Amino acid sequence: MDNIERLYKCYEILSEAGDKISEHVDEYKEILKAVKGTSKEKRLASQFIGNFFKHFPDLADTAIDAQFDLCEDDDTQIRRQAIKDLPKLCQGNADATIRVGDTLAQLLILDDPTELQQVNNSLLAIIKLDTKSSIAGLFQQISTGDETTRERCLKFIATKLLTMGPTVITKEIEDYIVEEIKKALQDVTADEFHLCMTILGATKLGSTITGHAELVKLATEQAELNNTDADIIAVDDEVVERFIQCASAAAPYFSKTIKSTAFVAHVCDKLLPIKTWNMIATAVSQDQIQLRLLKVFAEMITNTDKLDNASERINAVYNVLLEYMPLPKLSDEDLGDTPPSFQFSHAECLLYALHTLGKNHPNSLSFVEDAEKLKDFRARLQYLARGTQGYIKKLEESLKGKTGEELKTEENQLKQTALKTTSNINILIRDLFHSPPIFKHDIVLSWIVPKNNKLGKRHAPITFGEKAAANGKDKDQEPEKKSRPSNDQKFYSPPSGKYSNKVNQSYGNNNRTRQRGGGGGGGSGGGYRNRRFNKY
């Protein structure tokens, strides 16, 4: 009898043994040994191991390891079969479910789409069998795995687990997820922080005022607002990036009840002083980093309490605004054929911030009390208004007569956003040009999509120059398609570890140093090449 026939015979004996199946240990051991056999033997072993697993508890560890061996076989078909059969080990066995969940979590880093789909299917299957034990395996990898594994696990939770509905995500399970994600926040990279806050926002925390307050508290703790000074900010891009990430995570939850005062005060005190402002991100895309900072600042400022030292803080906004409001040319001849050049997106944010703070602190606008400063400010406003109105006219002419389909093109979408930006600037200038300024108009920031979209959409920054009239952007300007850096934008490589002093000096290579037990695959590099997952 050859090995294949012997395997079928063992299967037949075990299937027909009934209550006496536990007496047939030798037959089950023979099936386990088949994981070292030919391809066909391995595929049969994968199918048979799980069928009889629960009847041989003394061989549980051996059986699980045998199945795991098949999950890392050189043959793709055998790996897929073994991954598909893993859920059979989990029926009524919490310990096995945790181990299988841990293994499948590690396999989320697979690149082959067919294999990865099978991993997802098997994970979803065991989650339906025993939700808590399954996701305990996921959180083991979030705690001890390498960076890629951690990120894939968090993405799985955000995009698949939390969409499984209340029959799976019960109150107990949701509480467990919240507790474990909070633990994970103790040591996260920038991308992991974003994923963790996305997950928490999709739980009960995202739907109640008390939950919003807790989310803001978590973001505030990560931002470490009291632990940075101007000298550090000037030389360390990570500090600014950390603030932008944390402020962006908190921004959707600020309201009349939950105030953004601490974040706004931090921007005014630590980031907007001119010396510091001009040093921000000098080694990378400075305009883009500064614009991202200004956007989140503008989003937060509406929900600020009365500021202490309001005059000094408003003056910090005013001084940076002047950087984006050039003085007018001496005469029309000086202009020649070159239109004035403005960074409208930056100007919108700063004008809105000044307008909002001025409305809340009308007696703290120190430049209004200085005749020379007020004259200078009004001259700059008038010059900006001139450039804005000229740009609005060209944009309106460019968009006139366009069909609905034509307006959906990227170029025309950009022009429409530019029109919103410049229209907002025009409205704000009208109020601020009064002597003294008035604050009667309210606007919606150009990149915010009101209703049903807390976070809003970010659009490309806008400049005014030779190419602007044609396509709504400077010839050297690339659209800012995301509100935070991605692998494509390469504004900045986030460092390893928590947003604190635990920064790996070689963070530019995206390595991660962790003082943890274990690791995603039994080694500092995750061990993927030698072994895809940990054995117990």
Swiss-Prot record:
UniProt entry keywords in alphabetical sequence: Apoptosis, Nucleus
Biased composition (Gly residues): 516-528
GO cellular component terms listed in the entry, alphabetical order: nucleus
Localization per Swiss-Prot or TrEMBL: Nucleus
Single GO term (MF): RNA binding
Keyword Transit peptide attributed: no
Disruption phenotype: Enhanced E2f1-induced apoptosis.
Pfam families: API5
Parts forming coiled coils: none
GO process terms (BP): apoptotic process; negative regulation of apoptotic process
Biased amino acid composition, Basic and acidic residues: 472-487
Gene3D superfamilies reported for this sequence: Leucine-rich Repeat Variant
Bias type Polar residues, positions: 498-507
InterPro entries: API5, ARM-like, ARM-type_fold
Record has Nucleus as a keyword: yes
Region Disordered, annotated ranges: 462-536
Cross-referenced PANTHER family: APOPTOSIS INHIBITOR 5 (PTHR12758:SF19), APOPTOSIS INHIBITOR 5-RELATED (PTHR12758)
Family: Belongs to the API5 family.
Function text: Antiapoptotic factor. Also known to efficiently suppress E2F1-induced apoptosis.
Descriptive protein name: Apoptosis inhibitor 5 homolog
Protein species of origin: Drosophila melanogaster
